[in-house]
A protein has these predicted regions:
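Compositionally biased intrinsically disordered regions enriched in Thr/Gly
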Residues: 4-159
C-alpha cells in the first residue's frame, strides 16, 4: 500500500492589517479512507500578534457560548435541509458530546474571519462520522455585532 500527505494553505486578507490563513492537511495512510484536518490562524500585521476571541470579544465566555448556540441552530437547519438526513435530529447525526465540542469552537477548531464574517469548520470525526464530512458554519458580522469589544471592532475594521 502507499501513503499520501498533502498540505495546502489559503491566505485571505480582509483588510490592510488583518488576514487569516486556512490550512488543510490531507493524508491517506492506507486505511478505509483518507482524512482531512482543518486549521485556521487569524493574524494582525499591525500588532504582530495572532488574534483570538479573548482579544476581539467584549466578554469572551459570552461570545463563545453565543456562537456555540448559533452553530447548534445552523446545524439543525443543515440537517433538516439534507434529504439523506430527513427525520433525524442533531443527536442522531452528531456524537453524544457534540455540545461540549461546539463550546470549544474558538480554541480547538478552525475559526477564521473573512470579509463577510466568522467561519467555523469542524473536521470530519470532530462532530460526526467521516460520512458526514467536515461541518462548516458561517455567521455574518451583523449577527455577532453585540459581542465585539471596541478594540475587536477596530482590528476587524467593523467601525
Amino acid at each position: 500500500f502507499y501513503t499520501l500527505s498533502l498540505h495546502d494553505a489559503l491566505p485571505i486578507y480582509i483588510s490592510g492589517s488583518v488576514f487569516y490563513v486556512l490550512l488543510y492537511d490531507y493524508s491517506y495512510l492506507g486505511g478505509a479512507h483518507p482524512n482531512t484536518v482543518y486549521f485556521a490562524w487569524n493574524y494582525d500585521l499591525d500588532s504582530g500578534m495572532f488574534l483570538t476571541i479573548s482579544e476581539l470579544a467584549a466578554d469572551p465566555q459570552t461570545f463563545t457560548l453565543a456562537v456555540a448556540d448559533m452553530i447548534e441552530v445552523q446545524a439543525e437547519e443543515q440537517i433538516a435541509s439534507t434529504p439523506e438526513l430527513e427525520g433525524r435530529s442533531l443527536s442522531d447525526v452528531y456524537w453524544d458530546n457534540y455540545r461540549e465540542t461546539l463550546e470549544k469552537w474558538s480554541s480547538d477548531y478552525a475559526a477564521s474571519f473573512d470579509a463577510d464574517g466568522l467561519t467555523v469548520i469542524f473536521s470530519a470525526y470532530e462532530l460526526a462520522s467521516y460520512a458526514n464530512g467536515p461541518q462548516e458554519f458561517h455567521f455574518p458580522y451583523a449577527a455577532l455585532d453585540s459581542y465585539w469589544s471596541d478594540s475587536g471592532r477596530a482590528v476587524l475594521g467593523l467601525d
